[in-house]
C-alpha cells in the first residue's frame, strides 16, 4: 500500500509539473507610430489572439528611437534575445536587448552593422535566428545601398537587398555579408528550419507593383538560397512570421493597406491555403515574431502589469486625498 501511495504521489507531481510547463504561442508586437515600445499578444491555439497589456521595453537607441519589427528568439540557456528596427532612415544599425522573463531587460545596444557602408539608406526589419548546429545567432535584415544593384522597378534609394551577421553573444559581431539578391528589392525576411539541412526563407518582394510574399530554400541558414518562388499572397503584404501548429506551418503577415492581419497555412511551402478568415488579432497590433513561452511566464507578465496599474491608482488616490 505504501509503495502504491508513493507511486501515485510521483505520478501526481509529474502531472502538476507538466501542467505548469504548458506552452503558449506568443508574438512580439508594436503600435504605430512605433515610439511607445514593445508589446505582446498571446494565443492558446495559434489562431486566436489576445493582447497582453503593457509596454515592456521603451526604445532608447537609434536616431529616431522607434521600435518596429520586433524579432525575438530564446537561446538554449533560456534568455530571450530581441532585435528591432530603431530608425526609419539615415542610420546604420538595429536595436538589441535581452531578458530572462520579458519584464526586466538588459541595457539597450545599438549594433551598427552597416557602418562600413556610409551611403546606406536604412537598416530595416532585423530578424534573429539561432543556429543550434553552430551555437550562434544569425541576424538578417534589409538595407538599401544606392547604386549597388541594378535599380529595376525601384529607384536607387529604395532598392533593398538582404544582409546578415553572426554572433555568439551580441558583443563580438561577424563581418556583414550579403545574404540574398533575388534580382529585385526585397525586405522582411524570416528563416524557418525544417530539418538539419532544410531551411526556408519567407520574405517580401518590395518592388512595384507587387509588394507581396515569396519563399526561397537553402541547406543552411546563411544560404545560398534558391531562386525566389512565385508570390503566395496578394499585393501589399509584409512582415511575415511563421509558426508550426500541429503538422502545418502558419504564415502570418501584415495587410498594411487594410490595417489588418492575414494568414496562410502550408505543409511544404509550395502549396498554400489562405486562412485569414480563421484568425483573430486585436486591432492596433503590428507585425512581430511568434515564439513559445510557458504559461507561468505569461501569467507573470499579466500579474506584473496589474500590480503596476494598482500602484499607479493608489498613488493617484493618495495625491487626490492630500489635495482635499
Where are these regions (language model features)?
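Sec-dependent N-terminal signal peptides
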Residues: 4-16
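Carbohydrate-active catalytic/glycan-binding domains of CAZyme proteins
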Residues: 19-324
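Generic short N-terminal amphipathic or hydrophobic helices
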Residues: 1-4, 319
Amino acid at each position: 500500500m505504501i509503495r502504491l501511495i508513493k507511486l501515485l504521489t510521483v505520478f501526481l507531481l509529474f502531472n502538476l509539473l507538466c501542467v505548469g510547463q504548458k506552452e503558449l504561442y506568443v508574438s512580439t508586437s508594436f503600435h504605430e507610430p512605433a515610439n511607445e515600445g514593445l508589446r505582446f499578444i498571446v494565443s492558446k491555439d495559434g489562431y486566436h489572439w489576445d493582447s497582453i497589456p503593457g509596454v515592456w521595453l521603451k526604445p532608447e537607441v537609434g536616431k529616431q528611437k522607434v521600435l518596429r519589427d520586433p524579432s525575438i528568439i530564446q537561446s538554449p540557456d533560456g534568455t530571450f534575445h530581441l532585435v528591432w528596427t530603431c530608425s526609419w532612415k539615415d542610420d546604420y544599425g538595429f536595436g538589441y536587448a535581452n531578458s530572462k522573463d520579458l519584464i526586466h531587460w538588459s541595457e539597450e545596444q545599438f549594433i551598427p552593422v552597416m557602418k562600413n557602408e556610409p551611403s546606406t539608406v536604412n537598416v530595416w526589419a532585423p530578424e534573429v535566428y539561432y543556429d543550434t548546429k553552430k551555437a550562434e545567432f544569425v541576424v538578417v535584415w534589409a538595407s538599401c545601398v544606392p547604386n549597388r544593384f541594378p535599380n529595376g522597378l525601384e529607384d536607387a534609394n529604395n532598392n533593398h537587398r538582404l544582409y546578415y551577421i553572426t554572433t555568439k553573444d551580441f558583443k563580438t559581431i561577424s563581418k556583414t555579408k550579403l545574404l540574398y539578391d533575388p534580382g529585385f528589392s526585397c525586405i522582411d525576411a524570416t528563416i524557418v528550419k525544417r530539418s538539419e539541412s532544410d531551411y526556408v526563407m519567407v520574405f517580401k518582394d518590395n518592388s512595384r507593383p507587387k509588394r507581396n510574399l515569396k519563399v526561397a530554400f537553402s541547406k543552411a541558414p546563411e544560404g545560398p538560397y534558391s531562386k525566389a518562388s512565385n508570390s503566395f499572397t496578394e499585393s501589399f503584404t509584409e512582415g511575415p512570421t511563421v509558426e508550426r501548429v500541429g503538422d502545418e506551418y502558419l504564415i502570418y503577415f501584415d495587410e498594411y493597406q487594410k490595417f489588418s492581419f492575414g494568414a496562410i497555412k502550408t505543409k511544404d511551402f509550395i502549396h498554400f491555403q489562405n486562412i485569414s478568415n480563421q484568425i483573430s488579432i486585436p486591432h492596433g497590433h503590428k507585425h512581430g515574431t511568434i515564439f513559445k513561452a510557458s504559461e507561468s511566464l505569461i501569467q507573470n507578465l499579466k500579474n506584473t502589469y496589474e500590480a503596476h496599474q494598482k500602484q499607479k491608482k493608489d498613488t493617484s488616490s493618495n495625491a487626490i486625498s492630500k489635495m482635499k
